[in-house]
Each structure stands twice: as structure tokens, then as C-alpha cells.
Amino acid sequence: MNTPKELRYSEEHEWVRVEGDKVRIGITDFAQSELGDIVFVELPEVGAEITANEPFGSVESVKTVSELYAPISGKVVEVNEELNDNPEYVNESPYEKAWMIVVEPYDMSEIDNLLTAEQYEEMVKEG
């Protein structure tokens, strides 16, 4: 399982990368491997407001459809349109090519509520 140390993680298997006053969000390597081959990704529009712990989109795999949960509240300022034509990026490159949205957080301190890489790995091990 690939778990980059510089990221923060939600219990719902999303990752967060802080980039100045914004955050980039995607799903973890563990999540994509559990889902199997991703065939469709549904993401919010730029300008949408997302709320921490609430659904903001979904990923569809050959096995199932799974909701994406916002790890932080804020306004969507960028969406990875590449995933419309290339949903397989989620399986191939969950932390780079397959980022999903960029958000301008309402309260950056919400990041402190997220898990470190070590905490996330421990949570996954415990099941």
C-alpha cells in the first residue's frame, strides 16, 4: 500500500495535499485497490460548496459505486476533467494523475482533524 507521508487522510479513504491556501483531494491507493477497475468518476462543478464528511461525488468500478466524502469544507476551485475520459488514472496514479478536486477551505484548521499517513495505515490494518 502506497501512503505518501506528506499527505493527510480521512477515515473514508480520501487524501489531502495542502498547496498554499488550497487543498488537492483524491482517493487513496488502498481505496482504489479495494474498488477494482474504475470505469467512471462523477465530480462536482467548479464553484460548488462541499461540506466535511458529506458526499461530493462518486466513483464507479466494475464491482460497485462508491461515494466520495469531503475531508474538509470549502469551495471547489478546480476539477480534474481528465478523469472524464481517463477514469483508469484512479487505479494507475491515485496520488498524481488522479487528483479529483482542488478546494479553497473555509477553515484550514480542519486539516488537523485528518489522519497522518501512520494513523491511516494503522486504521487500514485494523480493518
Curated annotation (Swiss-Prot):
Signal peptide: none annotated. The modification N6-lipoyllysine is found at K63. Keywords: Lipoyl. Pfam families: GCV_H (PF01597). It comes from the Bacteria. Its cofactor is (R)-lipoate. Residues 22-104 form the Lipoyl-binding domain. Coiled coil: none annotated. HAMAP family: GcvH. The glycine cleavage system catalyzes the degradation of glycine. The H protein shuttles the methylamine group of glycine from the P protein to the T protein. Is also involved in protein lipoylation via its role as an octanoyl/lipoyl carrier protein intermediate. Belongs to the GcvH family. This is Glycine cleavage system H protein. It comes from Geobacillus sp. (strain WCH70). The gene is gcvH.
